[in-house]
Each structure stands twice: as structure tokens, then as C-alpha cells.
Amino acid sequence: DGLVGYANSIGLSKEGFPIISYHHLNAGDLKLAYCENIDCSSAKIQLLDWAGDFGYFTDIAVGNSGKVYISYLDRKNGDLRVIRCLDYKCGRAQINVIDKGTGKAGYVGEYNSIDITKQGHPVIGYFDNNFNNLKLAICEDTDCYRSVIKHVDTEGMVGEYLDLTLDNDTDMPILAYQDRTNMQVKLIRCSDLYCDNYESSIIDDVAKRGGDISIFQDTSNTLYISYYDFNLNYLKLAICKDSNCNENKTIIKLIEAKILPGIFYSWNSLIVNNSGNVLISFYDMNTNNFGIVYCDDEVCEDKEIINIDKIGKIGTYASMISDSNGRIFISYYDSSRGSLKVAQCENNKCN
């Protein structure tokens, strides 16, 4: 009961069913919904961490072996934590404190984003509110008992709205994030797993700030980055054809926020379907609808706006994923009912 799904992240289990980590706002708990079938008409709910304020920021990743990992913020102590599920439904779980904060006076772990290397080691990018830095935690084993903590970007207030992925070929971290000091959306491509060496690029000068960032690398290694431009009040898409996103970059304005500047098309999530089309979920705060931008061509000059759910205030904190068969799954928060929802698209266009 209460406000569940306020923050959520979706993955796919070893069986190919949706699995969602989420925050129960009233209770302050971190929970997991394990869908027991492909359409999630039946789900097992697991209580993962409680008696505090857990999971306000959370992300989930499933390794090649099917092991499930969940990164999240402990707001009571200000710590970054990682859960490793000990069975595929996460009925048993191991909790590790990765980086310690100083309570509510100084969080580490906001905007955390997790991915798993091909060797099964979790890598977590996150914002350190103590130092206002972008940080990276690299687990040195699959249990995440031991980890190396790196301050990756320390120039100004950097690391909010972070999203992380691992390069398809090199398995090295790629991080997209906000540089609030310089009012830019930035990209870092690590040259090694520990990010001792990296290339840094400015994706966009956004004059105020760029928020709600989502990153995806397709099978041809093209990078796609969606974000909200709070200056121009646009949901935007950056397409990077070169490795450092400097020489061959395209910026597309997708939708303009005409009614409520600054907060209109927020909480976006991005994937590329198995036909090579970009899909970006968004919340329309004017209509309170939840929808998708579907790109009909490579640079999204031709696009369609598709409504997914439009009864109530729905679609915040969305997370989207597709499986090897092209099926698309989206978890999102329905603030009218205070509930977590899952949508499964019946085709790769979600219409």
C-alpha cells in the first residue's frame, strides 16, 4: 500500500520476464517485482532493504549469467549500496555498502546507474553530493565484496542525471551526465575499466542545464543520448557516429515544451529496437500522459508521437528495455494511484 514505484528500473530475468527494482515512498523500502510471465499479469514482490529510506535512486542490471544486481541510495546514511540476488527471483539477497556518505548532510549514490561487464563484474556510476563529483565504482569480483572507487570528473558540480553503459566491444564505461557548473551535457568514454584515462566531450551547451539523461549504444556502436534542454524547453536527442562524439554528431530537437517550460517532457528513457529505430519514452506534464517518440528514420527527422497511457498522472520515472525478440517493456509510476505499472508493447513500434 502507498506510493510504490516512485523510482524504478526495469531489466529482464534469466527467463526473459520483466524484473523491476523500485522505491516504496511511504515505507522507505527498496522492493523488487519479479514478473512470473511475459506480460507481467502475475508478479512476485520481494522486500529487499527496509527500516530506513532505501531506493529513492535505483537501477537494475542482469549479467550474462542471469545474476541480478541492484544499485541504490540509502538516504538515511547517505550510502551507495549494491544488492546481489542469490537466486533468480531475488528471494535471498546480499547487500554491500559500496561507498559511504555522511547521512543526509552528504549523499553518495544519487543518480546511480549500473551495468555488468562480460566477466560479470558490476560497474556503477553515480553522483557524490559531498564533493559534487562524478564517481565510478568498479567491483573487483562478481559478489562485489571488493570495489575500487574513482573520482572521474571533479571540475565543478558534475555528475547529476547520469546514465552509464559499457561499450559493446571494449567493455569500458561510457557515461553521459550534466555539468551544472558549465551548463553542459557531457560524455566520458573510459579507455580502461577503472577510467584512469578517458576522453571527455561536450554533447550540448544547454545554457541552464540538461536533465533526465538516457544513453544507448546500438549494434553498430552508434551512441544515442536523450535529454531535456531546460533552456530551450526541448526534449532532445544526440546521435554520435564517432567514438568521442566530437566530429560526427547530430542534435535533434524532438518535442518543444510550450505550456510548462522546464518540466514538460521529463523522465525520458531511450532504446533502439531490433529494426534500428530509436524510441524515447517521456511524460507530458501538460496532458499528464505517458508517451513515446518513435523515430522513423536514422536521424529522427520523421517521427511519431505514440500515447502509451493517458488516464491520470502517469509516466514519471519511466524505464524501458527490449529483449532479443524485439519485445519492448516499460516500467513507470502512476502518481494518480501511487502505483507501479508495466507496459508491454505488442510490436516494435509500441503502437
Language-model features: where?
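Extracellular, repeat-based ectodomains that mediate carbohydrate processing or recognition
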Residues: D1-N351
